[in-house]
Amino acid sequence: MVRCKVTLSIILLIGLAMPIQAQTNLPSLTASEAHELQQAGELILIDIRQPEEWRETGMAQGAAGVSMMHPEGGQGFLRDVLAAVNGDTDANIALICRTGNRTSQVLPALQRWGFTRAKHIPEGMVGSQFGPGWIPSGLPVQPCAAC
């Protein structure tokens, strides 16, 4: 019984650590780095949260809103991301969500779809163990125009 509990605890700990491990192995930027690159015209920022979240907190200034929960599924999401980058899969893009969890799940799909310079912002809009976040860092936000 004790051995079973220990094994189960180890499996649970490994499972909980996997998202953190996945996030640290992905190409990433801090919120401040992304903001600087975006301001210089060298980065397209894509907010993959849902419209309710955009309304609640606003969006990073200049970000394209493309919800990962697209009503048309993955194909609709891909179509809208392609539209945000004018069809250029070599565009320098960064994905942002609330805390970096969703971007760490979506980024590998974009890489499989041929996006060669895609990155994510692990601290997200509100912060995580990877950093303070876009909003707490005092970076500019704007209301969602399409919400």
Write out the residue ranges for each language-model feature.
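Rhodanese-like catalytic fold shared by cysteine-dependent sulfurtransferases
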Residues: 3, 19-40, 52-92, 101-147
